[in-house]
């Protein structure tokens, strides 16, 4: 993981790739990116952006509960946002900065978790 993508939540280091790997195990998840967003309580908290497979109907809350049931207490996600696609660079890398900025611009800047 790139160091700038690492999430520091309550003094613990959380690697987005670990959380993305768990979410990718879900049968209805096609693509996923996890970013850290500001939290009054924890400093930062993990937030997942998920693209569902065609025809999938899993709700964000159900996916959140499923993932948090598999993750350690420190790694738990604050929220899951279902999106149509993830922004990518010309070489196919997910642009996590754009996801973070869009989330904050939408007025959801504090995911207290």
Name the predicted role of every residue range.
Residues 1-75, 84-87, 92-94, 98-101:
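AMP-binding/adenylate-forming catalytic core of the ANL superfamily
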Residues 101-113:
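Acidic/polar alpha-helix N-cap and adjacent early helical turns
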């Amino acid at each position: 993981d790139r160091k700038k993508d690492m999430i520091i939540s309550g003094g613990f280091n959380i690697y987005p790739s670990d959380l993305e790997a768990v979410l990718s195990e879900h049968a209805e998840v096609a693509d996923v990116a996890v970013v850290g967003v500001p939290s009054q309580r924890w400093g930062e908290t993990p937030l997942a952006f998920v693209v569902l497979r065609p025809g999938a109907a899993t709700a964000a809350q159900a996916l959140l509960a499923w993932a948090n049931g598999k993750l350690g207490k420190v790694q738990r996600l604050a929220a899951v946002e279902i999106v149509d696609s993830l922004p990518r660079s010309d070489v196919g890398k997910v642009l996590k900065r754009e996801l973070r900025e869009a989330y904050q611009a939408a007025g959801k800047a504090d995911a207290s978790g």
